[in-house]
Regions:
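Extended, alpha-helix-rich binding/interface surfaces that flank or overlap catalytic cores
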Residues: 54
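Helical hydrophobic small-molecule/effector-binding pocket
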Residues: 98-111
Length: 222
């Protein structure tokens, strides 16, 4: 069985961030592939993005993770695409997942320090950070298009822990402005992606806690 089939985490230990990321990517793939052409203009919890834009952004996130593993500049990857060959988004997302697995095949990458404008951490920590981004934007796309995916508890827990470290409750805007100063040329219009964390009820589902920490209302509807 390969990573593109039903168990993308099979080659990895249970706590390996590569497997966790690929499991989050499998959910993203299913959600992206299930967006009908009549839903592309639908609003999303990302106020400035419609469903088509969020889907394109998600694909670029996977491509950037692969670029990081290869030691390339992740910002060389465009923000998103308007179309993929044959309008086959499942194949495009699956290909990005395979690229991620190949690019991060070397175990040593998990301990290697990677520097981004907003973070410097070992590869394992960077992957966990991207788990949070993938899960949040998959939730955005699913909520916008009437889908109800489920995520493994350990995937959500990994993403939430990384988000709490990388996106503290206090000083978010200041941290973003500091990161913006280090962004490469051509990304000056990069907008602040997270609002203040929202409160959730005691006993809220893990996915609701994660998206609320990112500033999204878990009860959001179009």
């Amino acid at each position: 069985m390969t990573i593109t089939e039903t168990n993308p985490s099979l080659p990895y230990a249970a706590d390996d961030p590569r497997g966790l990321l690929l499991r989050s990517w499998a959910v993203a793939t299913d959600v992206a592939a299930s967006v009908g052409p009549d839903r592309l203009d639908d609003p999303t919890p990302c106020d400035e993005f419609d469903a088509a834009t969020v889907r394109a952004h998600l694909l670029s996130v996977g491509q950037r993770v692969a670029a990081l593993g290869r030691g390339e500049d992740p910002f060389s990857v465009g923000e998103g695409v308007d179309a993929v060959p044959g309008d086959d988004w499942r194949t495009a997302f699956a290909a990005a997942g395979m690229d991620v697995a190949a690019a991060w095949a070397d175990d040593d990458l998990l301990d290697r320090t990677i520097t981004l404008p907003w973070a410097e951490a070992p590869g394992a920590g960077i992957l966990a950070m991207y788990v949070s981004e993938i899960v949040v934007h998959t939730w955005d796309l699913a909520r916008a298009t009437g889908q109800s995916p489920t995520w493994d508890d350990d995937v959500v827990a990994t993403g939430f822990a990384a988000l709490q470290i990388g996106l503290p409750d206090e000083g978010r805007i200041e941290a973003f402005e500091a990161a913006r100063a280090n962004m490469p040329e051509g990304t000056e219009d990069f907008t602040y992606p997270f609002d203040a964390a929202l409160p959730v009820a005691d006993g809220a589902a893990p996915i609701d806690r994660l998206v609320a920490w990112s500033g999204r209302d878990p009860r959001w509807t179009a």
